[in-house]
Regions:
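Bacterial N-terminal signal peptides that target proteins for export
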Residues: 1-9
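Short, low-complexity interaction segments enriched in Ser/Thr/Pro/Gly
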Residues: 3, 23-24
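Generic surface-pattern signal
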Residues: 10, 51-54, 123, 181
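Core hydrophobic alpha-helical transmembrane segments of single-pass membrane proteins
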Residues: 12-16
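C-terminal motif of bacterial Sec signal peptides marking the signal peptidase cleavage site
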Residues: 18-20
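N-terminal module-boundary/linker segments of secreted carbohydrate-active enzymes
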Residues: 25-96, 101-108
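Substrate-binding cleft of extracellular glycoside hydrolase catalytic domains
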Residues: 96, 100-187
Length: 187
């Protein structure tokens, strides 16, 4: 009997969660707040993303054009493209180590290459997302170091590493500002 109740409860939660994800078509406060800051490209992206649930899904692949099974750094190459005939709709790249002013990311990919592939994906009509696994500013170890529970407090205003964290954010912002087409369109 308990097993049956657990199954029913799990099913109810799943249905409630799926219902919460259904598009309502209503504008949220955030939509109207940023309307004046949107570029034409941003509006186009948002409109296209809103259509996705009615048309299918978007498949993504991290570092897709940078390395794959048995290859690394080849131009115009992608495992997804080799299998499916086209690049994935979504690509992602990690900006970890940009805060350390390194030439390459924590995935050993040159930031200049990430920049170029971001522009290429934009030109193909695809979506790019970024992660940033920054090093632990408190311990100096990698992003997965959780040995000190005060790391978040150390980067907040008044924290011992707040200024360092702000400079790291500035490095990410500077990189993001370099993402533009030859015509000057910001990506």
């Amino acid at each position: 009997m308990i097993k049956r109740i657990k199954i029913l409860a799990t099913g109810a939660l799943l249905l409630a969660g799926l219902g919460a994800c259904s598009p309502s078509g209503k504008k949220t406060g955030a939509d109207s707040t940023v309307d004046t800051l949107r570029t034409a490209e941003t509006v186009n992206l948002l409109n296209n993303l809103r259509k996705v649930p009615t048309q299918g899904i978007m498949f993504g692949h991290h570092d897709d054009p940078l390395y794959g099974v048995g290859w690394e750094g080849d131009e115009d190459r992608s495992d997804v493209k080799s299998v499916c005939g086209d690049y994935p709709a979504v690509m992602s790249f990690d900006l970890g180590h940009i805060e350390l002013e390194r030439e390459k990311s924590l995935d050993n990919v040159p930031f200049r290459k990430i920049r170029q592939e971001t522009i290429n994906q934009y030109k193909r009509g695809g979506v790019v997302s970024f992660s940033w696994h920054l090093d632990n500013p408190l311990t100096g170890k990698d992003a997965w170091d959780v040995s000190d529970t005060t790391v978040v407090a150390s980067i907040l205003p008044g924290g011992v590493h707040h200024a360092k964290f702000i400079s790291w954010l500035d490095a990410v912002a500077a990189f993001m500002n370099t993402l533009e087409t030859e015509e000057g369109t910001k990506i």
